[in-house]
Amino acid sequence: MTVSLDRRQLLAGLGVTLASLALARPALATTGSLLTAAPGELALPGGAKPTRTQCFNATIPGPFLRAKRNHPVKLRFANQLETLSTIHWHGLRLANAMDGVPGLTQQAVKPGAGFDYTFTPPDAGTFWYHPPAFGPFLSQCEAGLYGVLVVDEDEPPQVDQDLILVIDDWNIGPDGQILAAPITESKPTITVNSKAAETIRLAPNERVRLRLVNATATRIARLALAGFEATIIAIDGHPVDTPFAPNRGRIDLPPGGRTDIVVDGTLAKGSEAGIALDRDGDVVILAQLVASDTAPLRSAPLPPLVLPRPGLPVALALQKARRIAVSLPAHEGSGSGLPGKPLFSVKRGSLVDLGIANKTPIDQAVHVHGHAMRILHPFDDEWQPYWVDTVAIGPGETVHTVFLADNPGKWLLHGRACGPSRKDDLLAWFEVT
């Protein structure tokens, strides 16, 4: 069920008292950094007792890593869990051997063992890392094993604060522990940066960049922005063609999706503004924006941003594209394993038109590894003015995407039902030779 989040409803919810919280800020990812996956505990909002989790470096989210575009990164993964694991670098167009898919790009890392991930990010933007979100590894993601990687632009846009909001949901039983399967009659606990909510304080004429990350496994995060103006500058790590305002103040983030927005400090003192999420019919406040009682940071707001071009093709010759059709559900493997043969194989430099028909009664989210896609308009050869690595497809809908297969290797193509079933309704891979 989707509820309409109107401005009055959202602002009414902002009357709750929110603690002043320090938001997560990216830290430098240096060569030789260590990411250790291990059991942990988290005191969830409203929880009677700590929840057993899995986490990187004893925090949820894990360390906020920062890298530079076209500069090499080397990170050591240490597996101190009791199960196999790897790290998938979600959204990065990196070398195939570093993509972190067990049985396809590497062997799973055994308990007590480690693996060195070395890559050079070609794109700036907001990315994140986690185990591959399918089969036995999905439960690790749901237990909190994830973090955010920010890759800086060569010349980052001028902002005064650069903040990250990581959205997650937790299906918790009466004993305070994570359920193997959600209870349909109960609603999950929603967190942002593992807290109930965040407070964002804006000085007059201050500019803030908010990096929104949907770390849930099966929830489309339907967000409503009220009481302030925002501009979308990037989606799934890549700058949009031209910055634009959210349609009617709404942003839908599929599982794994990211959207970067900028907000200027033009709030009147005493006004109420915030970001809320639709949780299966009710409103959950994620962040409150507050006009700080300080002197203006500058005499006027900063001018509109001029964004760099992504390192992706400007033009796409659709008439030359290889057309691939997929109907969901379309599990190509057996059990939780990957299929032995690729869904399709193309030569490097080929254009792929991937049509995905959702024949199920529930929303689906499909994620492509190692590449970025354009979403085509349904009635012409135009496309949306941004690139994505994950696309949401409604029940009975067909979505066509197009991408340049310019990254050699074997790449996962993965789709999951956005609901309690947690089904892998698409588990396949394709090869670029």
Spans of model-derived segments:
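N-terminal, post-signal-peptide metal-ligating segments of extracellular/periplasmic oxidoreductases
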Residues: T2-D116, V151, P157-D162, P174-R209, ...
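Extended terminal and domain-junction accessory segments
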Residues: T30-L34, E142-I172, D241-D363, L404-K410, ...
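Short tyrosine-centred short linear motifs in exposed loops/low-complexity segments
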Residues: N70-H71, A113, P121-F127, N205-E206, ...
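Asparagine-centered strand-capping/turn motif at beta-strand->loop junctions
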Residues: F77-L81, V213-A215, I356-T360
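Histidine- and aromatic-rich segments of cupredoxin/plastocyanin-like copper-binding domains
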Residues: M98-D99, Q107-K110, P174-P310, P378-D389
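Short strand-edge motifs at loop-to-beta-strand transitions and within beta-strands
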Residues: A113-Y117, T259-I261, D389, E397-T401
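Hydrophobic or amphipathic alpha-helical targeting/insertion segments
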Residues: P121-V151
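Active/binding-pocket-proximal capping segment
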Residues: G227-P239, K359-Y386, C418-R422, W429-T433
